[in-house]
Amino acid sequence: VGQSGTGTLNIKQKGHVDGGYLRLGSSTGGVGTVNVEGEDSVLTTELFEIGSYGTGSLNITDKGYVTSSIVAILGYQAGSNGQVVVEKGGEWLIKNNDSSIEFQIGNQGTGEATIREGGLVTAENTIIGGNATGIGTLNVQDQDSVITVRRLYNGYFGNGTVNISNNGLINNKEYSLVGVQDGSHGVVNVTDKGHWNFLGTGEAFRYIYIGDAGDGELNVSSEGKVDSGIITAGMKETGTGNITVKDKNSVITNLGTNLGYDGHGEMNISNQGLVVSNGGSSLGYGETGVGNVSITTGGMWEVNKNVYTTIGVAGVGNLNISDGGKFVSQNITFLGDKASGIGTLNLMDATSSFDTVGINVGNFGSGIVNVSNGATLNSTGYGFIGGNASGKGIVNISTDSLWNLKTSSTNAQLLQVGVLGTGELNITTGGIVKARDTQIALNDKSKGDVRVDGQNSLLETFNMYVGTSGTGTLTLTNNGTLNVEGGEVYLGVFEPAVGTLNIGAAHGEAAADAGFITNATKVEFGLGEGVFVFNHTNNSDAGYQVDMLITGDDKDGKVIHDAGHTVFNAGNTYSGKTLVNDGLLTIASHTADGVTGMGSSEVTIANPGTLDILASTNSAGDYTLTNALKGDGLMRVQLSSSDKMFGFTHATGTEFAGVAQLKDSTFTLERDNTAALTHAMLQSDSENTTSVKVGEQSIGGLAMNGGTIIFDTDIPAATLAEGYISVDTLVVGAGDYTWKGRNYQVNGTGDVLIDVPKPWNDPMANNPLTTLNLLEHDDSHVGVQLVKAQTVIGSGGSLTLRDLQGDEVEADKTLHIAQNGTVVAEGDYGFRLTTAPGNGLYVNYGLKALNIHGGQKLTLAEHGGAMAQRPICRQKSVVKGIWQSIRCDRFRFPTVRTTIRGQPTFRWGHYVPMRMVHLATPGN
């Protein structure tokens, strides 16, 4: 019809044409038209070409009926054009018993088929845009307008478009490919309640490829609807598929959605559009596959039944949810499933959410989850980050967002960071994560890091396990909080685990503001290696308060203090090591069972570090350090009052070489206490009293800063205290001193207490090496040495000499002198503290006058050969009851004992400065 010219065939009023091969516009320039109109008007064909080389039109209307039993082609050759309209109950049947019969729209030319107003078409395999030059369009519109096909190829080598609108319906018996071959382009638009329906059940032959090897699009809007098997966008490496679902009641329901199988797939769900996948779904399936999904403005993707959703199976997958978009899965979601897989999930705002039973971020591949700006991620079964050995997962929860793993059920709700692989969880800027139990580094080869950073950032869990069997780290910084509802935190649970809890920053990093732990009753070092690090910037007097118990019998456990001021309030019982590298660690625990607040750990105070002890280890308020002590930093002791005892034990050892600054406390320098300070500086501050026991007490140094030192000796007579201190350095002057490279400041004041008996019992020079006879008491530089020192800083002039009762010993003092138990005289002495001649601290004393009691005998020297130092002397004798002074060059007593009534007895051979001798009672 219309071979070279224009021809028209009208079949109506029950007209009937039985044809074989029918061509409309069979030659170039030909225009052929066939109209089949009215009920029982029939056209039968075998081969039907509408626009073979020219232009052809077929109109089937008002229940007209057409059949084609071999093939039907619209726009057969290049340059041809074929148009078909089936409307108003008209029907076109393109089939026979052979399912391979084809309906071609735009084979090499241009073809368009429109089914409207209740038109019906039944076909087998339908090909739209069959060849490279072919352009085909299929329009199905209006209520009751239906085309039923077996297989639909839209854009085979050419360009194809399918428009389903206004309640139009396409029924697919098997599968559909949109953008079949490389270079092709196919588009399907389902809009205005149009419906693309795949018949039958199950997965077989009900699938859709959007972009098989070419370029495909599926657009569903304005209440359009698609029901199918599995939909794949970007099937082959060259395939590119785009799916758009928008508007309320626009729905795709399928048996699974795959974006980027081996090619590139995109899906955008917006404006309350909905995708329901009743089967496994993936983004980036093969290694070359890239799948991207965007859910926005109230759009939703539901994955139902017992199936997985995988973002980045072996390829790259990205799921972005914003502006109220939602994802809901009734099973598990994987990100980065296989080793080459890379999966990313972005939740971007407060109205966006992601709900899944469980989520595995970085199963064998790499997974990243970013939840921000108030968005919510729910995975109430579990959350795994770094699932398997090669897996690496990162989850970032920020800006008031929530990851919730908790339900009213007691099952699962586990958060595991580093299961068999490497996991990282960052909770920042007010982000919140809630789980039943949280485990970091679950297995021995795994690694997990959790960071809670920023005000209102929160990790809430029942119990916390850091380093279950692998290497795990939890950092609480910048006011981030760990809330432990079950009260227990475990570090390094099983061998060979290493579990580290950082307050502020990690060891070796710059200090940061501290985070907090709430509701925890204990931090326990397990069978592996537990490490508790304090590296923060809180340097206030109150400090960072640690109220929970630190416990655990872990020989490898460590408490590391790098910066800030930290206060331990519990009677900690951990073992291992306490390393005070820098900053101030205060022990403020009060126990009654000997617990020091640092357990049985070995304590090392590095040079910049300071350890403050404000604690007690018994009910009386005393404190005994039972820990091994090392390092060359500062240990300060300030107990609840100055009468509370501080001391060391044998376990303390002799390796501490720093400064022991004793404030409010009482300390005894003997045995273990002395040994502990063998290489250390003892600094005695205000309200400290240190007693020096009998014998040599050898320590590294002594510095006076307002404290009190009691020496176990009496004066005068002694030249060396019964209990004295030997030091390398003695600091008894105001100013700075340096010890082990660290500067300290003292005021050089303090009290030195010695025994000044009332009366003083003259030892009678019973040991000539350590005591002096009375005759020698007026010699130059006579004194008792209290401290022996290699180096002396200061003169001791600011020190105060006191007796054991605390009364100041005046520079001029009269002593009652007893010999052999009887007071026989009074001596006028001068006393002062001095460091001359530069080798220690002395109490210098000098006898200025003797008043001998009447009827008493006074022995000035017990051993022969004694001589007064001064050559000029005075002798007083009795002449008619009046004292006279006799000047003598050098007075020598008789060589035999002479006894004069009322006068003292002198032994032979002694020189004595007689200016010192006064009889107590004139006239005797």
Summary of predicted features, one role per range:
Residues 1, 9-11, 17, 22-24, ...:
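Fold-core signature of tandem repeat domains
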Residues 9, 34, 58, 82-86, ...:
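Extracellular beta-strand repeat scaffolds in secreted/surface proteins
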Residues 5, 54, 98-100, 109, ...:
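Short "repeat-start/strand-capping" segments in structured domains, especially the N-termini
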Residues 18-20, 44-45, 67-69, 96-100, ...:
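Surface-exposed loop/turn positions within long extracellular repeat scaffolds
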Residues 475, 483-488, 493-522, 705-846, ...:
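Extracellular, surface-exposed repeat/solenoid domains
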Residues 14, 63, 89, 108, ...:
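Tight coil/turn sites that cap or link beta-strands
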Residues 1-12, 113, 218, 319, ...:
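N-terminal segments that cap or nucleate solenoid repeat domains
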